[in-house]
UniProtKB/Swiss-Prot annotation:
It comes from Chelativorans sp. (strain BNC1). Assembles around the rod to form the L-ring and probably protects the motor/basal body from shearing forces during rotation. This is Flagellar L-ring protein. One of its GO terms (molecular function) is cytoskeletal motor activity. PANTHER family: FLAGELLAR L-RING PROTEIN (PTHR34933:SF1).
Length: 235
């Protein structure tokens, strides 16, 4: 029985090890194709529609989209690019303490005398019941985040109410480590600045991800077998 269990455990470990890719052994992580960041959930690069030609009034040198003389044109159509400024400096600290104490005591007594003929007897009973509970709890949470990044995003969809859906990905490979920055969300055209930039706090449904993959990330993560045991073991 022990041999069967050991064999099954070994086969399970080999199966999980087979899930890991061996294509990047001895090679740095590959970069994603250009355009795939416009649709993070898609497996292929996003294809943008052809830009419609802006209407130019007769005898006019300027189109409606290029009519700003002192500012850059803003992103308004699918395929346009805008710059997202991410500046996060959040700090949070929580401290909770609770204490509860309860004590109860009960005393019960019983005494009696009886006589039968010349025999006399007595009976006594006494009982003490006591209980007590005490609970003390404390908790503290402290978090500090500081992130300052700039990324270019592209307009992937224009909603019926005029809002824009944006998405962008930036990848930087240093040696064998690939750092990936991803941004996605909904933007109101009125919040886009004159220089075609927008701050992250003005993006609704914002999804910001900053991480990476490569040799350092693999070393920092526990092996698949350990992750499996941490999940299934009750102790």
């Amino acid at each position: 029985m022990n041999k069967i269990a050991g064999t099954l455990f070994l086969l399970a470990g080999l199966a999980m090890a087979g899930c890991t890719t061996t294509e990047e052994l001895g090679k740095p992580p590959a970069l994603s194709p250009v355009g795939s960041g416009a649709e993070p959930t898609a497996m292929q690069a996003y294809h943008y529609p052809d830009r419609r030609q802006a209407h130019v009034s007769r005898y006019s040198l300027w189109s409606d989209r290029q009519s700003r003389l002192f500012t850059d044109p803003r992103a308004l159509e699918v395929g346009d690019i805008l710059t997202v400024v991410i500046s996060i400096n959040d700090k949070a600290k929580f401290e909770n303490e609770s204490e509860r104490s309860r004590q109860a005591t009960r005393n019960l007594g019983l005494a009696g005398t009886f006589a039968i003929g010349s025999a006399t007897g007595s009976a006594e009973a006494d009982a003490d019941i006591g209980s007590g509970t005490s609970t003390v709890g404390s908790g503290a949470t402290k978090r500090s985040e500081d992130m300052r990044l700039v990324i270019a995003a592209i307009v992937t969809e224009r909603l019926p109410n005029g809002n824009l859906r944006i998405s962008g990905t930036q990848e930087v490979r240093v040696n064998a480590e690939l750092r990936v920055l991803t941004i996605a969300g909904l933007v109101r055209p009125a919040d886009i600045g004159p220089n075609n930039t927008i701050s992250y706090e003005r993006i609704a449904e914002a999804r910001i991800s900053y991480g990476g993959r490569g040799r350092l990330t693999e070393v920092q993560q526990p092996p698949y077998g350990q992750q499996f045991l941490d999940t299934v073991l009750p102790f």
